[in-house]
């Protein structure tokens, strides 16, 4: 698809190598097999060949012609809608776009180089081929560019029939999601999918039959020209064989489960999710294009419409949209807008993936919301953010809750506290333990009050903006002043060295006094004579010491008459010194 000079240009050398030259003059080449983007020179871009056709992109303002048509033969049902919105500026600077959703926003510089190799693949939920992408076209507004798409659904297989029945007979929203190569500016479209909830805001769609598709194209600002020669049409090949019914059920049940969990979450946490405004803004962008709200809002939030005066209609007050042939198009009046929050935890679901990321079904889950007997069905885990609700009869999943129900139940608490309480992780109060704690606290307060001590809780100052605890500083020890302080402090840690030194001195003085008293007592006892034993006084017997055995005496002759008998003196062991009463009192006073 070569474009005039000075504009965005795309060359498809092979199905794996796609060359682009953007409006600002940058040139590069995409490699779909390696998943890479390489910047090249202008000479290399000019030398590249353009041999493979692409899905046509129609716009008289960008490509300088309005001679185009879309072949409608071979299909009975078509999907028409917006698959991408190009906006100026960096998505990082837009506070209404959550951080994890900014990668899906396309810069306005890439709207002329978005390309898909023909035949364009149309899938359901990025998994099951269900038809062909017939063409894209631009709708230029004042500050953005819409990229719209028309695709034909192949109803010859069971997959196409089930998809048509799902989005026409059931009240389920229909949206479009682009699977792009996640490098460069995401300019290479690998496939376009029909999903329930779009990741790119405002990318909603509708299904039309062969009889109503002309009105649908006109509603999305496209004017077909059946009389023009089909020379500019891409050569479409045959699509691959559609999968069996079981494969469609697997993908469809997963998509519906995600949608049900989304509805239950938004009703349980109305106005509490950060991406709520994101989806509301997307619905406004879609409404300004076709003049009516998206089904995803109309089908779920009829009872919660936004009360705001409708002072303008569609996009007519900003700039009247034009068809690709340059004819102004009058947008009908816009219906009252509605909105609901969108849970960010579902951005990884298969119906929300916009970049090329094949979905791998979960392998081990205990319960789900869908039919368990469907062959190949993988049950989904229950959403932890949704609380069990029971009022009257048990509501079906996604059933609207009464107004103010969540506020009465949660008491205005945050999601984290509510989740902890729901999972049973909140600490339970023990009445006996709490009473015992209060009783002990009262006793301590009373005892401390009697002692003249007041209990005061220490004030800990922390910075609320910093989650980490401030580091604790180690108190520096003062250097020891004397050798005694160093010896005492080394093994026992920090003590009052002055008090210890004083105590050691007092003990030394006491020991010296004790030695003097002992020496005095010994001197006094040695100076006193040993007392003689008398018949009336028996010598004290030491029970613990063995008694000495008396030596045998030699026989003595009786003394001669007229002489007196000699007095016998007993040889007794020396007695211990006796401590006087005054010395004992002196010793006790030490």
Swiss-Prot record:
Region (Disordered): 306-329, 528-590
Bias-annotated ranges (Pro residues): 543-563
Domain of life: Viruses
Protein name in UniProt: Uncharacterized protein ORF28
Organism annotation: Ictalurid herpesvirus 1 (strain Auburn)
Lineage of producing organism: Viruses, Duplodnaviria, Heunggongvirae, Peploviricota, Herviviricetes
Gene designation: ORF28
